[in-house]
Amino acid sequence: MEEKKETAQMTQETTPKDSRVIEGVRRSSRRSHAEPHSPKKAYEVRDRRQKRSLERDQHEDGTPIKRARLPREQSSTRKHPIVLLSREIPEYHTETMPTPKKNYKLIPEQVTELSEYEIERLNNIKENAKFLQSLKLLETASSLRSPPKKQNQTRGIKREKQTKVERQPIIRRSMRLQRIDPSGAPLPNVIQPPEPLLEEHPVKPPGPLEMVPTNLKGDCISVEEFLKTWASTSKESLRSLKKQPSKDFKRYTACLQTMTLREETVAKVVQNRIFSVAIHPSESRTIVAAGDKWGQIGLWDLADLSGNDGVYVFEPHSRPISCMSFSPVNSAQLFSLSYDGTVRCGDVCRSVFDEVYRDEQDSFSSFDYLSADCSVLIVSHWDSYLSVVDCRTPGTSCEQRASLNMRSARTTSVHPVNRDLCVVAGAGDVCIFDVRQLKKKAQPVLSLTGHSKSVASAYFSPVTGNRILTTCADDYIRVYDSSSLCSEAPLLTAFRHNNNTGRWLTRFRAVWDPKQESCFVVGSMARPRQIEVYNESGKLEHSFWDSEHLGSVCSINAMHPTRNLLVGGNSSGRLHVFHD
């Protein structure tokens, strides 16, 4: 007992006065490694263990030690819980004991002792947190973040949101045996004929249609002002058309470098994919037109700053408008041709779309002016027919119709000097016909060879007609010499060009520039998106591109006849106007 008292006094001297002692003892059922074999030794071992346990659970004066069990979730196992043994703390320890931290709760009978290492670790954590807070890293990171990029505001008409159609659940039972329809009504005994299906885009009625915009509701003042502007600019354009095209090629290429695209010269003009583009020949006012997939014609006056951004949408057709042109003689008239089998003339002076030619049993593909005064048209049909239409005669029929020895007729172009000749592009062949020899089964005067796939377009050069430009699906653009059409038209240039637009883009159609008939413009599949200008030798003269405002493929393009102005239309109904 004296030895135990001495060891207790030594432990009290080494233990700091300002700390409380909590001992954790895990009850264990471990047996000793050396088990006695005799019963007498076994009893002696048992007595020694009981004596040690009694001494461990009592104070020196014989009072029992209070026990505190940890909660079940804090104990490692249910079989061996951790027991905290707390000794009664003398009175002189409470005065010198340090105040506990906020995160620790002091139990009257239990106090957790922290080692010097743990106290130093907590102090280091606090100092590191204060140091990181003094650096202000979060404020610096938030200030370095770039501001959100401003989105370009969409000009013109807005995209219509399609309403979602909720589908009714399918009832898994026999309606036929119950003699009821899907709505639950009893079926009649007499079988009635099915009701005709309503078309989403019905065919327009025959006869003239009024020029009433579909994107404006009740705003008659702006419509009247636009029509007056169109009529007044048409009178001025007659003088500008008399100018001859420029012969200075260096000056022409220099002007191409000055043409740029701006945010205010991009607008959505129609709702769907653009199939044709036309430019008003006025030099004082910029008016462009676009025809889309479902018969809409969008007219855009770039100088009009009204609430509709100068965009006026009309619906004279019900199917794709594949060809459209302002009359070279009277620019107050806009001719349009559609797949629905109609050719109409939009007369701004009378505010109507007159019907020039109608054939409901057939589908039209293209047209051109056969006479110099633009009173006679030649129309190509998809099923390989040519029709001659005189706009001066009453009615909506044609004067002459001939079947071509071709699989189809996609485009037709009249020779600008010898107007009895026209070139027709079809499915794999390009032929030149003499209109005077058109019969029920017309034979071509000349055929242009070398095309291995379908030809999208073929056009005479706009001034002399000495060149023929073709765009083919075999990824080639070809230029033929048509100065002498007696025996053959030799191939001058054939260069590779990616014409594989796919299903959802309008096919490329390379067209001549009226200001420089040795150059032509065509869309491109290259990135960044661009519109390309080539000369007749196949050399790339210039590429129009703008990474900020031009982000799509412009399949259909057109050049102004006298001004440095280019218009490109894409498959979402937008027009992009490049000008100096």
UniProtKB/Swiss-Prot annotation:
Keywords: Repeat, WD repeat. The keyword Repeat applies. GO terms for molecular function: DNA binding. WD repeats lie at residues 269-310, 316-356, 359-399, 404-443, 450-490, 500-544, 548-580. GO terms for biological process: regulation of DNA damage checkpoint. The keyword Transit peptide does not apply. SMART domains: WD40. Pfam families: WD40. Residues 142-155 have a biased composition (Polar residues). InterPro entries: WD40/YVTN_repeat-like_dom_sf, WD40_repeat_dom_sf, WD40_rpt, WD_repeat_DNA-damage-binding. Residues 15-76 have a biased composition (Basic and acidic residues). GO terms for cellular component: nucleus. Belongs to the WD repeat DDB2/WDR76 family. Specifically binds 5-hydroxymethylcytosine (5hmC), suggesting that it acts as a specific reader of 5hmC. This is WD repeat-containing protein 76. It comes from Xenopus laevis. The lineage of its organism: Eukaryota, Metazoa, Chordata, Craniata, Vertebrata.
